[in-house]
Amino acid sequence: MVGPGLGINRVRRKGVYSTKKGSGDNLLLMKRQGKHDIHDRESDDLSGHDAFSPSKKRGKIDSITEDEIEVKKLSTVATFDKLSRSFPNSEVQAAKNAALRGKEKEEEKVVSIPLIQNLKNEDIESIKCRNNNLLDGKKLLLEAELSAVEDNQIFSSSFPEDKKLSLQSCLSSKEQIIKKLQVREEYMSKFKLPPMLFSDELLTEVEPFMPIVMDILEGKISSVYYFEAKNAFKNSQKAYLSVDEFRKLNLNKFTAGFYGLKRQLRVGEEIAKRYKRALTHNQPATLKWWGITDFCNYVLAPETLTSFCIYQLNLSNKSCSSKTPNKHPKQQLNEKEYYYDPELRMLAYDLLEDTVEYGIIVADSDPIEQWEAAIEEDRLRELKLDVHNYSSRRWRLDTHD
């Protein structure tokens, strides 16, 4: 159908139009009207006359600007230029003003929204530091789960209720020091225990007995501590030793008695350094579950100290075994058969089990480094206690004499 006086064939399909005359004015207007038809389906039932009515055209422009629909600058300018030929200047100017007002409102909305385009350098560094701290915290937490934690609550909760011992007894109050002396005198008279060595002395003395580590890993010798560690692993439902399970362990079964936990952990640390390669290759399931640190601290260290105990106390004199004739301990130092003798080791195991209390209350509160001895004596003077009677130095000197 041809509109009056226009001679235009309109083929309407989703806002696409064609014209025989190629009138630029009508073509641009039709395209603009067609674009609006895509977004506003209500214009589909407009008649051909309505589509080209000046009032309708202006109404469409006003509605577009009122609804704040974005109009491309080039298309808008071209359209208004073409409309100026058929519309009075006042109407065209009003339409332009309306469009400009709509554009200003749009810009105001955009400006009012605070957008963060990028993070400041200091913000990035702050986040990186915070994330690193979190990672370090997780790493520390994992190490605490798989290593010996010198924590009062852990150790105190690990002992039975009837014999609950706490590292709080190692604190330097007057009552605790008096109690420590009583425990020391009781055990020394009953078991004739050797003096407490400083850490450097202890590591030097136990070094010849460390080859037992490889013999345990290779299954050449049975180990009471390994047996207990394996039972703990089998009774666990977790892939590794957790803090909760560690707290539930009875540390009496993993403590080298009168040597105390502090000295035991020093030996375990040295073993982990010396046998790192062997401990990280072909790990048995029990070792994997415990982790290298705890396995060294609570299995290999007490076994090494068991051999040292046999040597220090010359337990062969208390054994009826025919395998241990009257040999000087120094001559027997490198004889594995002597230190691996089941009867001798059972004597040592029993002694260590019976002297756990001594290890916790006495050994762990005795100076482990030589420079700590002076601090101990200064504390005794502050509490107005007799230094000679209460200091650990007395027991080291008297025993050696």
UniProtKB/Swiss-Prot annotation:
Keywords: Cytoplasm, Nucleus, Phosphoprotein. May be involved in a process influencing telomere capping. Residues 35-48 have a biased composition (Basic and acidic residues). The gene is RTC4. The lineage of its organism: Eukaryota, Fungi, Dikarya, Ascomycota, Saccharomycotina. Present with 799 molecules/cell in log phase SD medium. One of its GO terms (cellular component) is nucleus. SMART domains: RTC4 (SM01312). The keyword Oxidoreductase does not apply. This is Restriction of telomere capping protein 4. Belongs to the RTC4 family. It comes from Saccharomyces cerevisiae (strain ATCC 204508 / S288c).
